[in-house]
A protein has these predicted regions:
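Small-residue-rich transmembrane alpha-helices and their cytosolic helix-loop interfaces
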Residues: 21, 68, 72, 99, ...
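C-terminal transmembrane helical hairpin of 12-TM major facilitator-type secondary transporters
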Residues: 28-30, 62-143
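A late C-terminal transmembrane helix in Major Facilitator Superfamily
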Residues: 131, 144-174
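Extracytoplasmic gate region of multi-pass secondary transporters
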Residues: 6-83, 134, 168-169
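Hydrophobic alpha-helical interface/terminus motif in multipass membrane transporters
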Residues: 35, 39, 140-141, 145
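Membrane-interface elements of multi-pass transporters and channels
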Residues: 42, 46, 88-89, 114-115, ...
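Cytoplasm-facing, short amphipathic helices at loop-to-helix transitions on the intracellular side
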Residues: 14, 91, 147-151
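Flexible cytoplasmic inter-helical loops of multi-pass small-molecule transporters
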Residues: 1-3
């Protein structure tokens, strides 16, 4: 086990997986902790005659809660599709696309006015990419190092995800 750990920490591929999952945790925790409050405080007023009113969303606080539920629903779809795609296409390229997609979605959201429509679009896009990294990351670790060491090496990568989560929540509140 010691030998494979030394090999992994010297492997640029493993360190990229480690760093990627750190950023994944950062993004997810940052959005989970701070996005509903951002929507509540910064969103344009809700149009009671629009689609929000049809869904019973009458306040920006309700829109923030709805946004998290959209992220959750889209996450189911995105994660299943990522697992399916990971069997057919290169996992590292799919992971790169997911991380790039998150960056594009975040940049788009930052550059647009915060309305119910932009919140919904961002929530779906981010939700679709939310945990789509998990089957690809674990599959990539297993592919590179084999099933025998997958649990240990993926566990270390997952630890980086949790550290990234802490940093994302903490820095968002500073």
């Amino acid at each position: 086990l010691g030998e494979i750990l030394r090999l992994a920490v010297r492997d640029p591929s493993y360190m990229m997986i480690f760093a990627g999952f750190f950023s994944c945790g950062y993004q997810i925790a940052f959005i989970t902790a701070h996005f509903p409050a951002l929507v509540t405080e910064m969103s344009a007023p809700i149009d009671p005659l629009g689609w929000c009113g049809d869904l019973g969303i009458e306040t920006t606080a309700a829109l923030g809660g709805f946004a998290i539920s959209v992220i959750g629903a889209a996450n189911i779809i995105g994660t299943l599709m990522a697992g399916w795609a990971g069997k057919r296409f290169g996992k590292k390229w799919l992971l790169s696309g997911i991380y790039a997609g998150r960056s594009i979605a975040a940049a788009w959201f930052i550059l647009t006015p915060i309305t119910a429509n932009t919140v919904l679009i961002f929530s779906f896009a981010m939700g679709f990419l939310w945990l789509a990294t998990v089957p690809l990351t674990s599959g990539l670790v297993a592919h590179i190092y084999g099933i025998r060491y997958m649990a240990t090496l993926y566990g270390i990568v997952f630890f980086s995800h949790q550290v990234g989560s802490f940093v994302g929540v903490y820095l968002g509140g500073v």
